[in-house]
């Protein structure tokens, strides 16, 4: 049997060699393809904790271009279920798995363990990419973790990613993107800070409001396609799930029709909102009001949903299938019922993949047809709060 320490050392050496060979060619490609710029950053010797705002699915690649040592990434456990890509990631990178929609204390312990072994760890403390263009809230536990780690904390901000890879789209655009270190906190500084104070600092360091930046054209094709995975409530007729997209056009069966341009803004004769972020803020207020009624009757529903239980080896075990509903009382999928109070949280991966944790078990919900997962994510968040 191979010695785990020897195998671990071999893997780290392989990661260093891989980074040394590919970092500069990849950096050149990202500059050509996305107009991405960054610089190789000077960082403290030894392990450090790196906090980055989450803007695209390629964030680890963008971030890696700034550092000359391989990072260990905290990632959603779904990266272990991506076929051949997962095999490549396991061979040439190290990850710490975290289950979305859960309060994962195991991930926190693994982060501390990795730092104490001498390796730097990169994580995205918001856990979610922004739908609106404004950075999402940082997990409060992130500040406590940084203080407990007793290593330098580095905050790193990516800008332009929201338009480069809109959360609703599976197509990337070319405009302008940049990454840089915002601040380095020493262990001595962290030791005298209160978690609430540090949380405010981290939030400020990583915050981005994409629509407040100077407008830049982000060129691409089919700019509106899949926007209905983000915007599910029509401001004209007030109905849910009546919005559809095609190419650059976004419309409702009631007659509402707008186009989205290369600046991520709407165009048309009767545009209800300037951009998707404003539309989302409006529908959030409506969803909050819906949640406050806390009706026992279903508030949301979709047919053709499959529920899986996630085992420790990242296998999806079928549980049930059928209609999914969410009320103020419970989440129902097929013949499985989960009281709202038994669910720790609902996570959303990409545009429509839902996951949650209930009574210590992790679950994934898939759909046999395109459907909006964000409406469930939004409503559940307001029900719990």
Locate the predicted segments by residue.
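Soluble catalytic domains of membrane acyltransferases
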Residues: 12-23, 28-198, 220-221, 236-237, ...
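Phosphoinositide-dependent membrane-docking surfaces
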Residues: 50, 98, 324-354
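Structural motif
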Residues: 70, 249, 257, 323, ...
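Short hydrophobic/aromatic-rich beta-strand segments that constitute the beta-sheet cores
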Residues: 73, 260, 331-334, 356
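A conserved mid-domain beta-alpha-beta active-site/ligand-binding segment of alpha/beta enzyme cores
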Residues: 185, 196-230
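Cys/His-rich short segments
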Residues: 219-272
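Anionic N-terminal interaction surfaces
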Residues: 268-323
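Acidic, Ser/Thr- and proline-rich intrinsically disordered linker/docking segments
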Residues: 342-385
């Amino acid at each position: 049997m191979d010695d785990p320490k020897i195998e671990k050392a071999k893997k780290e050496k392989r990661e260093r060699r891989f980074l040394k060979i590919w970092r500069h060619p990849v950096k050149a490609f990202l500059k050509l393809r996305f107009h991405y710029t960054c610089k190789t950053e000077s960082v403290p010797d030894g392990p450090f904790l790196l906090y980055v705002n989450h803007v695209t699915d390629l964030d680890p690649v963008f971030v890696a271009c700034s550092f000359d040592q391989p990072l260990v990434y905290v990632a959603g456990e779904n990266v272990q279920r991506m076929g051949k890509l997962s095999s490549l990631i396991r061979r040439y990178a190290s990850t710490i798995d975290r289950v979305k929609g859960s309060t994962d204390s195991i991930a926190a312990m693994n982060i501390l363990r990795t730092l104490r072994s001498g390796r730097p760890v990169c994580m995205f403390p918001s856990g979610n990419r922004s739908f609106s263009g404004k950075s999402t809230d940082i997990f409060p536990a992130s500040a406590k973790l940084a203080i407990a780690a007793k290593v330098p904390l580095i905050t790193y901000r990516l800008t332009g990613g929201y338009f480069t890879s809109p959360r609703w789209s599976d197509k990337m655009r070319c405009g302008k993107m940049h990454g840089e270190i915002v601040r380095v906190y020493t262990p001595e500084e962290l030791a005298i800070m209160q978690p609430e104070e540090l949380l405010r600092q981290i939030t400020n360091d990583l915050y981005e409001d994409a629509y407040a930046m100077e407008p830049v054209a982000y060129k691409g094709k089919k700019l509106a396609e899949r926007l209905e995975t983000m915007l599910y409530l029509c401001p004209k007729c007030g109905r849910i799930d009546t919005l559809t997209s095609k190419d650059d056009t976004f419309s409702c069966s009631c007659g509402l029709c707008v186009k989205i341009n290369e600046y991520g803004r709407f165009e048309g004769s009767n545009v209800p909102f300037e951009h998707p972020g404003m539309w989302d803020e409006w529908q959030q207020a409506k969803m909050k009001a819906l949640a406050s009624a806390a009706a026992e009757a279903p508030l949301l529903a979709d047919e053709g949903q499959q529920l899986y239980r996630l085992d420790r080896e990242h296998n999806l075990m079928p549980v049930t299938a059928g209609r999914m509903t969410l009320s103020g009382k419970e989440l129902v999928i097929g013949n499985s019922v989960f009281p709202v109070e038994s669910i720790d949280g609902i996570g959303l991966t990409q545009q429509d993949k839902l996951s949650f944790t209930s009574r210590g078990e992790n679950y994934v919900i898939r759909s046999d047809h395109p459907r909006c997962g964000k409406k469930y994510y939004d409503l559940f968040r307001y029900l719990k709060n």
